[in-house]
């Protein structure tokens, strides 16, 4: 009799242990972190933000957060953060089902790539605008100072065309109308919206420029809190950053918060 009781107790202990493990396993799988792991999706919180990163002083090909954008959604080879690519793929599939084709034409640019763009324009404009603040203001209509571009972050991308007129009629108008109606469902927002929306500071409107908010809002908050004007250096006109209020009016002058 004693032996039978002992055997029954062992069976009940074994059943209880298996049930407990099963319950814990189900609980783990249904947590957000486990779901992200199970589905292969990256976490939306970046815990490794640094000043060098938000100012573009890194190489995306050496950063595990980044990957090459698949060719079916890109016009050329470029890098973006993985969650941005996954979200854009979902958005592109939804768009194509409604007859709208979305292609990424520009992705991540680090500090040195942005410096090359800035200094090429600076030198090209010098005969007309000189080497002072007027030159910088002209460039800043559509291009960022190195160290202040949202393209540094791997969260921002340009879609389909860089010509303002493209989005005013026909195919381009249908595309921008679809984006303004649906992009928010996938985490994207229009950064430099029309002036008519009340955005009076910063760059000219860019219908093509969209940002993945779940990550870019983290970087913007860090940028506005940590980047100082003495951090701007090593390019033509860097000494003008404070006079131009690059941090407050350009980095902060957006409709995507």
Language-model regions, residue ranges each:
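N-terminal Sec-pathway targeting helices
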Residues: 5-17
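Bacterial N-terminal signal peptides
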Residues: 16-27
